[in-house]
Amino acid sequence: DAIFGEEYGAKSGTSGLTWVLDPIDGTRGFVSGTPTWGVLIAVGDDAGPQIGVIDQPYIGERFIGTPQGANFIGPHGEGAIQTREQRPLHEATVFTTFPEVGSPTERAGFEAVAEKAQLTRYGMDCYAYALLAAGHVDLVIEASLNSYDIQGPIGLIHGAGGIVTDWQGGPAHNGGRALAAANPEIHAEALAILREFP
């Protein structure tokens, strides 16, 4: 297997599979002592991740997504998880890491979605994606991502029944802009807005 990661660079393999690793996603959260950071692991091929893990070792929570489904393991038990059921954007909870999101255009795109949502939250790093997979959040919108920032969350969210694309509806596993959604309906609603910000 090949390996690619923030700390490791790229090491080639022969199986067609690549492990994508980010040992501390959310460095600012880690440094400040907030449990919003995590370890990201993905296994996939050129088409994208098939398995995704978000692990928060400080509070002992692990979220695992595979093509067969998604599971949570934590100090109070374990079990299957899935994304939220359909709700309109005006009832949605939207997360991003930084209020400035990315470029001025990307910030405007995020704000165009956020102003239509019921609740907007900032500063959750990779833990926002875990909350989406577990059914607590409707949308996570980010920009300026590296592939190792998003591949673990993609595998997890797909396993939990959600969708992750770029802001034009294409694949997001190579990094850049990401729109993670709990279900196809709210994804379509947010995507229709974000497509206006190329």
Summary of predicted features, one role per range:
Residues 1-24, 163, 185-198:
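N-terminal subdomain of lithium-sensitive/metallo-dependent phosphomonoesterases centered on the IMPase/IPPase/PAP
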Residues 13-71, 92:
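DPxDG-like acidic metal-binding loop motif
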Residues 6-7, 22-25, 29, 138, ...:
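Acidic active-site catalytic centers that drive phospho-/nucleotidyl reactions
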Residues 35-37, 58-59, 68, 77, ...:
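A generic "binding-loop/recognition-motif" signal
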Residues 55, 65-66, 78-87:
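Short amphipathic beta-strand/extended segments with alternating polar/hydrophobic composition
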Residues 48, 69-72, 76-78, 101-103, ...:
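Short helix-loop capping/hinge motifs at secondary-structure junctions, enriched
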Residues 82-198:
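An extended, acidic
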